[in-house]
From Swiss-Prot:
Source organism: Protochlamydia amoebophila (strain UWE25)
Gene3D superfamilies cross-referenced by the UniProt entry: Exo-inulinase, domain 1, Phosphorylase Kinase, domain 1, Tetratricopeptide repeat domain, Transferase(Phosphotransferase) domain 1
Gene (UniProt): pknD
Function per UniProt: Together with the serine/threonine kinase Pkn1, may play a role in the specific interactions with host proteins during intracellular growth.
Enzyme kind, highest EC tier: transferase
Protein name (record): Serine/threonine-protein kinase PknD
Protein kinase domain residues: 51-342
Binding site for ATP: 57-65, 80
Active-site residues (renumbered): 186
Length: 982
């Protein structure tokens, strides 16, 4: 034992005085206080080994529980000792000690802990805390008597809500024991004690067993005849447990399971609700005989004055179901239902059945083509036909959808729609939420919000040719998805959707589905203070909603609800502005409301709100600035996931119609959102963007790393297309901090700066890199210096300094050569172009590189109006190549035809360009000259595209001799540069 006292040591449990005795026996009276040292009821001596027994507090079949004093720790404890007449029976003793050992392995606040265990030839006992209080049985009995006598009810027994808090603690302890593989097998109110200070403890684990434990012996070899007559000892080999709390299948000899413990919990729950047992049972044999005649009485009718909630009555009935399939499968399921009750949620009411075969149930029932990312693609390669059905009836508040689904052999899945807006408010076909349940053929289960993936769950799928019960619950801002009554995942929506319709979506017809059962549960006992103004907002009562939001914000300035109310007050103005003739005053009011969140713990909501305000007036640039400010000022704020969800949603939304805005949101996403939070749906959008954008000729990647890694390789061209030199500067700063030094990425970012016109900024960045990193000279730096030198030296000097001594066979510096040639064309210095062309005449160039070099030569000939040499060089290529709009020579050949063959032939040639939504830059001039490029298209073009168009038209009008238009486009050309400086 961990502590020991000699036999002659004595401590009085009453006055706590200690002395040493010259004899081993406990004295009859304390020599200090004079109190008797014998138990008045049993006459037993107070001293027991190392503890002083004070009194007996309970008896059972195998043992007795005493209140005792532990002198080592100076505390009162409870000792459970085996009956002395049972010590001689090894199996009884073993069973007694098994309870102690099994309980000691369970560590839970609601399971009584074990202090010590002792067993020898003379005794067997274990110690545990002494808890002052009443058993649940005593509380039920006392409350029932008070009710009968018309007295004031016990504070606990008289409150079903308080009893449910106790019950859920019991359930949590049992669930914990089950998780450790232990069954209690004797759950009943007398084994549960409620402490003086609210402690809830499950006692008496004497019948507990491990779930996977082998069956006990059927018979006890030497079971004494004297014990067989004692009813208070459960016989080994017999069905163990208390009949009143025993599951029917257990009484019939089936082994104990988790569901038999759940049945016992159901009986306890029934007693807590009604103060009476659900069934009258006698002995085990009588129970077996009368089992089929037991009648269920609903707790609501069994105790009409207790006002038993129907929800709790239904939980009780499910616990006590004779059909194991209908009984709770785990205690966790019961806990979830009890928690729903404690949170005040009402029960669901079925108000509609929507049959896919009944046309009158559906407002919209068509096959539609869903195309994604149209704003950034040249063809609808991300499009598919789907069958779409939207309910005619609307469902407000909390909504639940239930249906049985069976996918066929070729079925890919089924989609459930909810929170779909009214037809007049739908900007796109699929709005609201869509739960797509994929089959085992595709495994693409996901939850989408306005066609944007917010949950990706590939491990959840429906096996083909099997029927599943699907349940979707939308409660407040949460969506819970169940399959066969098992929760699969939950999702919390940060920005509410107000839609009230439901629907179905399918990619094929290979499925069977039962009519959709639609439930609503609008009432909630514990109403969130925001629910009231939310309801006003949903019904467009803006003034009342605003008044309530402001009142909540004023009342709870330091709580999340108060700050959320400020945010929603701003949203109220935005909703009101949607239908107002004069929006601007309302938008100003919204911005003022969002401004109040500045400096609070919910500060990012200020920028989210302002972004929503700018979105409402289609000012995407200011909208994105708000998101950038939020991420820059609060990079690790816990509210940022709300902004992230909105950013991703907006990215997919604008990808349908707005190309430049899509690029802006993509750059924002790549630069600020965590890479591991980018979902597969968004990555697919990035892949589509990369596939369809024009490859910039001055960006070079020799390593195989793909752009879709969302690294700077993706951000750099995005920043260039959007003409964002300072973001390129930030990218460079990030690259410098990324060892090993990524020379290729740094060079590309610097070249982008030069091409934008920010060559001074590029020079300063290059100087910083070389000064602080002390890098060795690199051939790429030489090319970059040549790029920059074109802007502050004469072209002749640049040629002498950088290109004069380049070996004629060396093509490594071709990028710099081509850039230098472009500068010569801009300054009409064609002689240097001819010189460089001769210098590289015998260089080993690829077909594409030779083509780009020859394009500059043809351009120079056309500037010099040297039609002969221009034609000779053009006709070194086939007519088929010259007529292809995919060739860089296409526009140059058209200019040559204009001056040599006439306008009619040239127009036919220019008109041969393919009609695509976003043409390549080298076809822009041809489209403009054939009136296939609108002024609106020009306004929506990127700066680089405008520059290339102007450059082509400068050449064309130079060739035809229209000096006025040439000068006009020359001025426009000069405007397409950004001269950023540090």
């Amino acid at each position: 034992m961990p502590h020991s006292f000699p036999d002659y040591s004595f401590t009085c449990p009453f006055c706590k005085n200690n002395c040493k005795l010259s004899f081993a026996q406990c004295p009859a009276f304390c020599p200090f206080c004079g109190k008797s040292q014998k138990n008045e009821s049993t006459g037993l001596p107070i001293q027991s080994d190392f503890y002083q027994i004070i009194k007996s507090i309970g008896k059972g079949g195998m043992g007795e529980v005493f209140l005792a004093y532990d002198p080592c720790y100076e505390r009162q404890i409870a000792i459970k000792k085996i009956r002395s007449d049972l010590l001689e029976h090894p199996q009884i003793k073993k069973r007694f000690l098994k309870e102690a050992h099994m309980t000691s392995q369970l560590t839970h606040p609601a399971i009584i802990p074990i202090y010590t265990i002792r067993s020898d030839a003379d005794t067997a006992y274990y110690t545990m805390p002494f808890v002052e209080g009443d058993t649940l049985k005593q509380i039920i009995r006392k409350t029932k008597l008070q009710e009968k006598n018309g007295e004031t009810l016990d504070y606990l027994g008289g409150s079903i809500l308080a009893l449910m808090r106790v019950f859920i603690t019991i359930c949590q302890a049992v669930a914990y024991a089950h998780s450790k593989g232990v069954l209690h097998r004797d759950l009943k109110p007398e084994n549960i004690i409620i402490g003086k200070y609210g402690e809830v403890l499950i006692l008496d684990w004497g019948l507990a067993k491990f779930i996977d434990q082998s069956p006990e012996e059927e018979l006890l070899a030497s079971f004494p005849e004297s014990l067989t007559k004692q009813k208070d000892i459960t016989k080994i080999g017999k069905v163990v447990g208390t009949v009143a709390y025993m599951a029917p299948e257990r009484a019939l000899g089936q082994p104990a399971t988790i569901q038999t413990d759940i049945y016992s919990l159901g009986v306890i729950l029934y007693q807590l609700l009604t103060l009476k047992s659900p069934f009258k049972r006698g002995t085990l044999d009588e129970f077996r005989k009368n089992m089929s005649r037991e009648e269920w009485q609903d707790p609501v009718t069994a105790a009409p004055y207790r006002e038993v909630p129907r929800m709790l009555a239904s939980f009780t009935e499910k616990c006590l179901s004779l059909d194991l399939q209908n009984r709770y499968q785990s205690v966790e399921e019961l806990i979830r239902d009890i928690e729903n009750y404690l949170e005040g949620r009402s029960e669901w009411f079925c108000i509609a059945n929507l049959n896919t075969k009944e046309k009158n149930d559906w407002e919209f029932q068509e096959n539609v083509l869903i195309a994604e990312h149209v704003a950034i693609t040249r063809m609808t390669d991300d499009a598919e036909w789907v069958s779409l059905m939207i309910s005619k009836q609307s469902f407000t508040g909390n909504t639940k959808i239930e249906a049985d689904v069976c996918l066929g052999e070729q079925g890919h899945g089924i989609g459930f729609l909810l929170s779909v807006p009214e037809a007049s408010a739908r900007e796109h076909l699929i709005e609201g939420y869509c739960l797509w349940l994929g089959s085992d053929f595709s495994k693409t289960t996901k939850l989408l919000r306005s066609n944007v993936e917010v949950v990706h769950a590939p491990d959840i799928f429906l096996k083909r040719q099997q029927t599943y019960h699907v349940r979707i619950e939308k409660v407040d801002k949460s969506i819970h998805v169940y399959i066969n009554d098992n929760l699969q995942f939950s999702y919390i929506a940060h920005i509410p959707l107000i839609g009230t319709h439901v629907g179905l979506l399918s990619r094929d017809a290979d499925f069977e589905i039962s009519p959709l059962e639609i439930y609503v549960g609008n009432l909630n006992i514990n109403v969130n203070c925001l629910a009231v103004p939310d309801a006003f907002l949903a019904h467009r009562d803006y003034n009342q909603a605003l008044s309530e939001y402001r009142r909540i914000a004023y009342s709870f300035p330091d709580r999340t609800e108060g700050r959320e109310a400020l945010f929603r007050a701003g949203l109220t103005f935005l909703e009101q502005a949607k239908t107002a003739e004069n929006k601007m005053p309302l938008l100003e009011e919204a911005l003022n409301e969002f401004e109040k969140l500045h400096g609070t713990p919910s500060a990012p909501l200020e920028y989210l709100g302002k972004a929503l305000a700018y979105e409402s007036i289609n000012d995407s640039e200011e909208e994105i600035k708000c998101y950038e400010l939020a991420y820059r000022r609060y990079p690790n704020h816990p509210i940022l996931p709300m902004l992230q969800e909105q950013i991703i949603s907006r990215l997919h939304e604008v990808s349908r119609m707005q190309r430049i805005t899509t690029y802006r949101f993509t750059l924002l996403t790549v630069r600020h959102l965590p890479l591991n939070k980018i979902d597969t749906h968004t990555k697919r959008l990035f892949n589509s963007l990369q596939k369809h954008w024009e490859v910039l000729p001055f960006i070079e990647y020799k390593s195989p790393s793909p752009l879709t890694t969302l690294s700077t390789r993706f951000a750099t061209p995005l920043a260039f297309w959007l003409a964002k030199p300072f973001i390129l500067g930030e990218i460079l700063d990030d690259l410098i901090q990324s060892p090993p030094f990524p020379i290729e990425e740094v060079n590309n970012a610097l070249l982008c700066l030069v091409e934008l016109g920010s060559w001074e900024y590029a020079q300063e960045k290059l100087n910083t890199i070389q000064t602080y990193l002390n890098l060795p000279q690199n051939p790429k730096w030489l090319d970059l210096k040549a790029f920059i030198a074109c802007h502050y030296q004469t072209l002749e000097d640049v040629y002498k300094d950088f290109f004069f001594q380049i070996p004629s066979t060396n093509a490594d510096h071709l990028h710099a050569v081509l850039y230098f040639m472009d500068q010569c064309l801009d300054q009409l210095n064609t002689s240097l172009i001819y010189t460089l062309a001769r210098q590289f005449e015998h260089a080993e160039l690829s077909f594409e590189d030779r083509l780009r070099l020859n394009c500059r030569r043809v351009w120079a000939y056309l500037l010099d109006k040297n039609w002969q040499d221009a034609g000779n060089l053009l006709y070194t290529y086939s007519v088929e190549t010259l007529n292809k709009d995919s060739s860089l020579l296409h526009f140059l050949y058209g200019c040559w035809l204009q001056v040599t063959e006439g306008a009619e032939i040239a127009n036919v040639h220019f008109a041969g360009v393919n009609p695509v939504m976003f043409p390549r830059t080298w076809t822009l001039g041809a489209r403009f000259l054939t009136n296939n490029l609108s002024k609106d298209s020009y306004e929506k073009a990127f700066m680089w595209e405008k520059r290339q168009l102007c450059k082509q038209l400068i050449l064309y009008y130079h060739c035809v001799g229209n000096e006025t238009k040439r000068i006009h486009f020359q001025k426009l050309y000069q405007e397409q540069f950004i001269h950023a400086e540090l």
